[in-house]
A protein has these predicted regions:
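Short glycine-enriched, charge-decorated loop/helix-capping segments at active-site entrances
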Residues: 89-94
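Flexible, glycine-/basic-rich loop-and-beta segments that form/coincide
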Residues: 155-246
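Conserved Class I SAM-dependent methyltransferase catalytic core
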Residues: 39-43, 95-154, 161-167
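Conserved SAM/SAH-binding loop
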Residues: 60-66
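Class I S-adenosyl-L-methionine
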Residues: 1-52, 56
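Local beta-strand N-terminus motif with an aromatic residue
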Residues: 10, 71-72, 142, 163
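Amphipathic alpha-helical repeat scaffolds
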Residues: 76-81, 119
Length: 247
């Protein structure tokens, strides 16, 4: 919906780490004429995706084996999370963990003016080190971000984690820039969270609070607001995602 509001209708769409292609299945009608490209490491899941989307160009291999520079108009998906690195010669020097690597590689594969809409762990935005956010900001403009409550993926992943949807538009070339969202601020409870969400609390779709970790510490979390449907909240939030799709 957010990408449609920007003016995107059809083009080359990439879903890296696609699983069985949940995002492909949710494409709005006006985008159905797009050419779909997917990448999935797991052979069984990848074969299921090929059966579900026979017209899509699906690669059953690691994302590191693909290399379509400046090719895609739109990239969507759920970024894999982990503390390990992917062995990709072109990116090894960055030292990024897998979810950060997916952002870096996708930024190279999307064309200038193209859009990335990724679901990622809140630590992309909230981790102490600004290094990865600075890398992204130099190569793409943050059009907006939506922070989801911790139960948003309970049915899918069986875990209560806070996730973000990030909307990025690739720049024509990397520039030296350090916008506010590269850095952290503090919320009213004193937790360090991304400056974007400090400045735009309306983009947090739940109540900010804390929870006890397995180590007995208090950690930031977002709990759903009783009586509100997440689908309705998302519909309202995407209106704040500012961007114009460039053909």
């Amino acid at each position: 919906e957010a990408v449609g509001n920007m003016g995107f209708q059809t083009g080359n769409i990439l879903e890296p780490s696609m699983g069985v292609g949940n995002f492909f299945g949710l494409l709005p009608e006006q985008m159905q004429g797009s050419k779909l490209y997917g990448v999935e490491l797991d052979s069984i899941t990848g074969r299921i995706a090929k059966q579900l989307y026979p017209k899509a160009d699906i690669t059953i291999a690691g994302f590191e084996t693909t290399d379509r520079k400046d090719f895609y108009d739109l990239a969507v998906g759920n970024v894999p999370f982990g503390q390990y690195q992917v062995d990709d010669r072109a990116y090894n020097k960055l030292g990024f963990s897998i979810h950060d690597y997916f952002f870096a590689k996708t930024l190279d594969q999307v064309r200038p003016g193209g859009v990335i809409a990724f679901v990622t762990s809140r630590y992309t935005m909230d981790k102490q080190s600004p290094e990865v956010r600075r890398y992204i900001a130099q190569r793409a403009e943050l059009l907006g971000a939506i922070r989801l409550p911790n139960n948003a993926f309970r049915a899918n992943a069986g875990t209560d984690v806070v996730s973000d949807i990030l909307f990025l538009q690739k720049r024509d070339r990397p520039i030296e820039i350090e916008p506010d969202w590269v850095h952290l601020g503090q919320n009213e409870d004193g937790f360090a969270i991304n400056r974007y969400f400090v400045d735009h609390p309306e983009m947090i779709l739940g109540r900010q609070t804390s929870e006890s970790t397995q180590y007995g510490k208090q950690d930031f979390t977002v709990v759903p607001i009783e009586g509100l449907k997440l689908a309705d909240q998302l519909h309202d939030a995407v209106k704040y995602i500012r961007g114009t799709y460039q053909v």
